Amino acid sequence: MNAQKGFTLIELMIVIAIIGILAAIALPAYQDYISKSQTTRVVGELAAGKTAVDAALFEGKTPKLGKAANDTEEDIGLTTTGGTARSNLMSSVNIGGGAFATGAGTLEATLGNRANKDIAGAVITQSRDAEGVWTCTINGSAAPGWKSKFVPTGCKE
């Protein structure tokens, strides 16, 4: 009598089914992880802008996106000379909320470009009050798959 060598077809089919079930469970969790890590990354990239804004204000200059037109302005480094966001996860970066004329203002980044489709369109806002205190808020209403768990530590919705 010959001994069996290898696997039967049914055994291989069972293994493939198990792998398929595990992949179906893992993929959505992985997508959520990617969305949160990308959101956290953009908050970190805006932190560099916050530091540059504080430094410009300390020197008596007006923070600006793009090349400074004169000695009273300071480029905070979040955009290229062409005006596009340096980060491949941001579709736009803006200065608003008074443009730091009195020390208060906002840095706003809209997620887009290479950001995960679930978070594209969300707006991350770093707001500075006149005393120099920064707060982070995220508006995910424009993002098609936004979930509250994408909000990184230190920010609020």
Swiss-Prot record:
Bridged cysteine pairs (disulfide): C136-C155
A Gene Ontology cellular-component term: pilus
Xref: Pfam families: N_methyl, Pilin
Subcellular location: Fimbrium
Record key words, sorted: Disulfide bond, Fimbrium, Methylation
Similarity comment text for this entry: Belongs to the N-Me-Phe pilin family.
SUBUNIT field: The pili are polar flexible filaments of about 5.4 nanometers diameter and 2.5 micrometers average length; they consist of only a single polypeptide chain arranged in a helical configuration of five subunits per turn in the assembled pilus.
The protein's name in its UniProt record: Fimbrial protein Q
Native species: Moraxella bovis
Gene: tfpQ
